[in-house]
Amino acid sequence: MQVLVRDNNVDQALKALKKKMQREGIFREMKLRGHYEKPSEKKAREKAEAVRRARKLARKKLQREGLLPSKPKPVFGADRGRGAAGGAGGAPRPAR
């Protein structure tokens, strides 16, 4: 894998290299190969990953078709759903 270093900017080249390695899945593979994985464990992990992918695809498809609401966007700002008061909100907590 190669990355060009422009104007002796090593930080930018390292950032580009890290991004390429992330896209290629090298970090994930290094993590998996860090220890021995029994064939039965590998098979179970791969099966679980496939199930997760299938569920994610099905969920995305339902969201596109409008049958499933998409995740609500996070609210940034002062209010954040605390009501009009903006404080702790609600009734005071009972003493223990």
Curated annotation (Swiss-Prot):
Compositional bias segments (type: Basic and acidic residues): 37-52
Domain of life: Bacteria
Any single biological process term in GO: translation
GO MF annotation terms: structural constituent of ribosome
Keywords annotated in UniProt: Ribonucleoprotein, Ribosomal protein
Pfam family, one: Ribosomal_S21
Keyword Ribonucleoprotein attached: yes
Disordered: region residues: 37-96
GO CC entries: ribonucleoprotein complex; ribosome
Basic residues biased stretches: 53-62
UniProt-listed HAMAP family: Ribosomal_bS21
NCBIfam families recorded: S21p
Family from the record: Belongs to the bacterial ribosomal protein bS21 family.
Protein name: Small ribosomal subunit protein bS21
Organism expressing this protein natively: Afipia carboxidovorans (strain ATCC 49405 / DSM 1227 / KCTC 32145 / OM5) (Oligotropha carboxidovorans)
